[in-house]
Amino acid sequence: MSANQSQSISGALSQLTSSNSFYGGNVDILSSLLQFNLMWASVFLLAIHLLVNTLVYYIPFVGRLPMVGTINNLIWFVATLLLIILVYVASDNIIVKAFGGILVLLLLLSVIILLYKSTMFFITLYYHQSFMVAARGPTVLSVNGSHYSLDFIPSAVIITTRQGKCFYNGHDLGSCSADSCSVILFSGRYRSEFEVHRNSPKKLTVDVCGYTTLLTVYTPKASKTDV
């Protein structure tokens, strides 16, 4: 092999090495940009999640808007997923990997909650054919057409009057008579409807989820009945 040939081979190898280092540098830059974008996207979504929770806590009206809870859970799910991807892409540290495992558990919990809420939404929508009920379900109380989401079946429904208006649990029902209100209780696929007036029994038997439940309905002037 001549000296010229060996010089040309070494030159080609040096060019190949510099080319590989150039592309390797580009890959490192793209990887860093990806990690940076993942981090800020997850931080942004978590900030929205915390903001929604704060608004629901201090402004209860926000929590009664349709699909707020489901959308907030979806935001938490996506933010957690992005954090998991970021942790497993960015680090080989075992401690960081363990932190990623905790995030995986949180993600699975979010998936379970999201699947449960979505399933109950479609079940309620199928049985009651009402988007308003399904969005606030699965347990919903309707008083004169106004729907209220409940965490559990109430033992009493208290309807008060003030300055010619009716109120249920602080919610304005408008101008109506507290002696005659239409109350509907939705729970899953069950629906119980009854009228509230002076001569109606104050203790009502309601069929909810296949079980007989006693529900007390009264106005301020009526004597309270223990359940």
From Swiss-Prot:
Source organism of the structure = White bream virus (isolate Blicca bjoerkna L./Germany/DF24/00) (WBV)
Assembly, per entry: Interacts with many viral proteins in infected cells. Interacts with envelope E protein in the budding compartment of the host cell, which is located between endoplasmic reticulum and the Golgi complex. Forms a complex with HE and S proteins. Interacts with nucleocapsid N protein. This interaction probably participates in the viral mRNA packaging into the virus.
Keyword Iron-sulfur on entry:
no
Output this protein's name: Membrane protein
- Return the similarity comment: Belongs to the torovirinae M protein family.
Top-level taxon of the source organism: Viruses
Query: What is the annotated role of this protein in its UniProt record?
Result: Component of the viral envelope that plays a central role in virus morphogenesis and assembly via its interactions with other viral proteins.
Q: Which residues lie on this side of the membrane: Virion surface?
A: 1-42, 88-95
Asked if the Swiss-Prot or TrEMBL record annotates the protein with the keyword Transmembrane helix, the reply is yes
